[in-house]
Regions:
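Cytosolic, low-complexity regulatory segments enriched in Ser/Pro/Gly with interspersed Lys/Arg
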Residues: 1-73
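Primarily EF-hand calcium-binding motifs
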Residues: 51-85, 92-119, 129-144, 167-194, ...
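Core solenoid repeat modules with strong leucine/isoleucine-rich periodicity
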Residues: 143, 193-200, 208-213, 222-225, ...
Length: 403
């Protein structure tokens, strides 16, 4: 009977661990401040536990002095264990037997390159440093960066990148917008307006951004880097050139001049039906999403973006009716160029053969990504000059080089 009297009410478990603390609300500034302070102190402590440049130099000297084969810069497991006993407590977590096994390069005696070891530690330290750096901008403390968090991060990173020194201050907000869109386009698949910090660390975008610290970066590498000044200025310049009425937005007629100027009318109609517009006009942010999709057509995220536009009935697949809806405009352009229009039946068979969908009459996004030719498939349906290049690929390949 006493047992029943002393029983705790359901849900009350004072002794058990608490795994979840509610986030402070907007009208709780004191709790918010306390949470921010606690996180900031935690990140500071973590930062102090990282290896600094002097400790990394010291590690290299220890590795250098204990390599088993000085001419080859290789180390045996026995010497590796010796190094483990010599390094500081901060370094020890990096020097495990698992790491040694992971860095094996097929050496017949099971030795490992000391350079590989050192680079492994450097990379790990950099990742931890960057994770702490990004976490400082995580306003909710949930391991995500929102669009505003990312904007703050890149705005503060800007002055540390020598390759961006030449940018006009008035262009900064457009640059930040251009940089942030790439993170959101590729890493925010569910369009929640936020990106996981772990996903940022796992992709190459930060490497591309930090490449701009290199003052000697070649023109060619800059042009290939979305985050470089030439790339950002090129994209913004194209937007300004398209904006013929200079109102800062693009209407359908203006967007028709994009790229080769041969995106089809049905595709442009669907772009304006599907994407966020303001009184039928597109802003720079939406334009950037479209550019990222069209410049990276082979990537799954770009295919998902373009598939949504092609799926005119929102049915989750493309069928012969949908393909014909888009291809008619390609046939019209062929006639306008004085060429004989290709039969839709032939193209339809070719497209289905290209994708080999699980259902022989329906092409899903998964089919498109899996076939490895999604970029060609999409291009044939939405852009006349890409279709023409595909149609005449044998002739182009057979032509002698102009060099």
């Amino acid at each position: 009977h006493m047992k029943h009297l002393t029983k705790k009410p359901p849900g009350e478990n004072k002794g058990g661990p608490r795994f979840y603390n509610k986030l402070p609300k907007e009208d709780e500034p004191l709790r918010q401040k306390l949470r921010e302070e606690s996180r900031s102190n935690l990140l500071k402590r973590r930062s102090q536990n990282l290896l600094d440049n002097n400790e990394l130099r010291e590690l290299w000297m220890i590795l250098d002095q204990n390599q088993s084969y000085p001419d080859e810069q290789l180390i045996t497991y026995a010497d590796y264990q010796k190094v483990c006993s010599l390094v500081s407590p901060k370094v020890k977590p990096y020097f495990t037997s698992i790491v040694f096994a992971k860095l094996q390069q097929g050496d017949s005696q099971g030795r490992v390159s000391i350079m590989s070891l050192f680079n492994y530690v450097m990379r790990k330290v950099w990742l931890q440093q960057t994770r702490i750096g990004l976490s400082l901008y995580d306003s909710s403390g949930q391991g995500y960066l929102t669009e505003i968090d990312l904007e703050n991060y890149i705005t503060e990173l800007l002055p540390t990148l020598p390759q961006l020194e030449g940018l006009e201050k008035s262009f900064y907000s457009f640059y930040v917008c251009t940089a942030v869109r790439k993170f959101l386009f590729f890493l925010d698949g569910v369009r929640a307006g936020r990106v996981r910090i772990l996903d940022i660390l796992a992709c190459s975008f930060l490497d591309d951004l930090l490449e701009l610290r290199d003052e000697e970066l070649s023109k060619e590498l800059q042009e290939q880097n979305w985050f470089s000044a030439p790339s950002a200025l090129r994209i913004y310049g194209q937007y300004l050139n398209l904006d013929r009425d200079h109102n800062g937005m693009l209407n359908k007629t203006e967007l028709a001049g994009y790229g080769s100027g041969t995106l089809t009318q049905p595709f442009l109609d669907r772009v304006f039906q599907t994407l966020l517009t303001y009184s039928g006009e597109m802003d720079y942010k939406t334009y950037l999403d479209l550019v990222l999709a069209l410049e990276n057509r082979a990537e799954p995220q770009a295919l998902a973006f373009l598939f949504r536009i092609l799926d005119i009935n929102n049915q989750g697949y493309l069928d012969a009716f949908t393909l014909n809806y888009f291809f008619r405009a390609i046939q019209d352009q062929m006639r306008a160029h004085g060429a004989e229009a290709v039969s839709f039946e032939d193209v339809k068979d070719e497209l289905f053969d290209m994708v080999r969908p699980k259902n022989p009459e329906r092409i899903t996004l998964n089919d498109l990504v899996a076939c490895g030719q999604g970029d060609t498939f999409v291009s044939i349906l939405i852009e006349f000059h890409r279709f023409w290049a595909y149609e005449n690929r044998e002739a182009v390949t057979a032509e002698p080089s102009q060099d």
